[in-house]
Amino acid sequence: MGSLSIWHWIVVVAVILLLFGRGKISDLMGDVAQGIKAFKKGMKDDEKTAEKPEPVKTINHNADGSGAARSDTGSKVI
């Protein structure tokens, strides 16, 4: 009772074909194929952007302290 025979599968396929028709099923399969192609293209685009290294950023430091953060020692604190 738990297993489905070949006749069960034939009836299921026949009902699906009657409900959706041949045209709708082929359109659906075409849409699925387009979705898979778009997904694969997106994955390739992500790999291409991941392969490009970002340029190295340098930070200029001055030994005399110019350009360093200011201190507000001259302001009054009340």
UniProtKB/Swiss-Prot annotation:
UniProt keyword list: Cell inner membrane, Cell membrane, Membrane, Protein transport, Translocation, Transmembrane, Transmembrane helix, Transport
What spans are recorded as compositionally biased (Basic and acidic residues)? Answer: 43-55
Location of region: Disordered: 43-78
Recorded GO CC terms: TAT protein transport complex
Q: List the disulfide bonds.
A: none
The cellular location(s) given in this protein's UniProt record come to: Cell inner membrane
Q: Name one Pfam family in it.
A: TatA_B_E
Q: What Gene Ontology molecular function terms does this protein carry?
A: protein transmembrane transporter activity
Entry annotated with the keyword Ligase: no
Q: What is its main location?
A: membrane
Residue ranges annotated as transmembrane are: 1-21
Entry's Gene Ontology BP terms: protein transport by the Tat complex
Membrane topology, from the record = Single-pass membrane protein
Per its database record, what is this protein's job?
Part of the twin-arginine translocation (Tat) system that transports large folded proteins containing a characteristic twin-arginine motif in their signal peptide across membranes. TatA could form the protein-conducting channel of the Tat system.
Assembly notes: The Tat system comprises two distinct complexes: a TatABC complex, containing multiple copies of TatA, TatB and TatC subunits, and a separate TatA complex, containing only TatA subunits. Substrates initially bind to the TatABC complex, which probably triggers association of the separate TatA complex to form the active translocon.
| HAMAP family linked | TatA_E (MF_00236)
Q: Which family, according to the similarity comment? A: Belongs to the TatA/E family.
Name of the protein described by the UniProt record? Sec-independent protein translocase protein TatA
Query: In which organism is this protein found?
Result: Nitrobacter winogradskyi (strain ATCC 25391 / DSM 10237 / CIP 104748 / NCIMB 11846 / Nb-255)
Q: Which gene encodes it?
A: tatA
